[in-house]
Each structure stands twice: as structure tokens, then as C-alpha cells.
Amino acid sequence: MRLLGLDVGSKTVGVAISDELGITAQKLETIQIDETKYNFGMRPLKKLVRQYDVDGFVLGLPKNMDGTSGNSVARSKAYGKRLEEKFNLPVYYSDERLTTIESRRVLIEDAGMHDRKKRKQVIDQMAAVLILQNYLDLHRKD
């Protein structure tokens, strides 16, 4: 089962993909979106769905640290609903608390990426990888 992991922000969507066995997640790209112009990145996602023969999506749910839901959760669920309607594929959700912070730490400490501009380009993809990998790990059938 091949899944796309998405880290949906207000301006970008980080995209990761699972391998065909659903074991590992790899970063793919960052898609620019503009909600004010109703550009939700569906065209590039459609291309990826076709290219990789995707079976579904995993979206991060940006819950508050105390577990409550805020506006960002509602936005993520609305994006998920849009994906379901557009692609007729299942959408799963995964807690994304701290994924952006963890991505930043990995890029700075582990990869030595101190250039802020370069890091910004990759951080959404890394967050998508963490969201997807967390989901895959929780749902792995050993």
C-alpha cells in the first residue's frame, strides 16, 4: 500500500511517500499553495498520485500540546475532505505535534544544515516524512 504523507501549512504542503511495502517514508517535494486564490496544490498532487500509483493519504493533525484541537486541525480536516472528494482515496490522520521542531533539529544537528533558506525548503518535506513514518510504524503488521 503506497501512501502520500502531507504536512499541510498555510503556504506550503510538504510531501513524502511510502515505499510499496508501507515500511519507510521518503521526502518528495514541497508544493506551494495559496488559499486566498483557492490554489490547494491539487494539480501537483494529482500528478504524484498517478506517477506513484498512490492508495491513500496521511495528513498531519496539528493538535495542541494538551491534545485539544484548534483552527489548524479544522483546516487539516477540511484539506483531507477536499482530497477525498478529488481523488476518491482514503485519508488517514496522524498526530503531528512536534514534527516541525523535530525536523528542524534533524536538519541542524544531524545534517549540519545551518543555512536558514535551504533548511526552510526542506523542513516541510521532513515534517511530512515524520508524519508518514509515525503512521506507518503505528500500523505496521509484523
From Swiss-Prot:
UniProt keyword annotation of Electron transport present: no
CDD domains registered for this protein in UniProt: YqgF
Enzyme category, top tier: hydrolase
Signal peptide residues on this chain, from the entry's feature table: none
GO biological process, one term: rRNA 5'-end processing
MF terms (GO), sorted A to Z: nuclease activity
EC number: 3.1.-.-
GO CC terms in record: cytosol
Hydrolase as UniProt keyword: yes
Pfam families: RuvX
InterPro entries: RNaseH-like_sf (IPR012337), YqgF (IPR005227), YqgF/RNaseH-like_dom (IPR006641), YqgF/RNaseH-like_dom_sf (IPR037027)
Subcellular location: Cytoplasm
Main location class: cytoplasm
NCBIfam families assigned to the protein according to its UniProt record, in alphabetical order: RNAse_H_YqgF
Protein family (similarity comment): Belongs to the YqgF nuclease family.
Function: Could be a nuclease involved in processing of the 5'-end of pre-16S rRNA.
HAMAP family per UniProt: Nuclease_YqgF
Entry protein name: Putative pre-16S rRNA nuclease
Organism expressing this protein natively: Lactobacillus acidophilus (strain ATCC 700396 / NCK56 / N2 / NCFM)
Lineage of the species this protein comes from: Bacteria, Bacillati, Bacillota, Bacilli, Lactobacillales
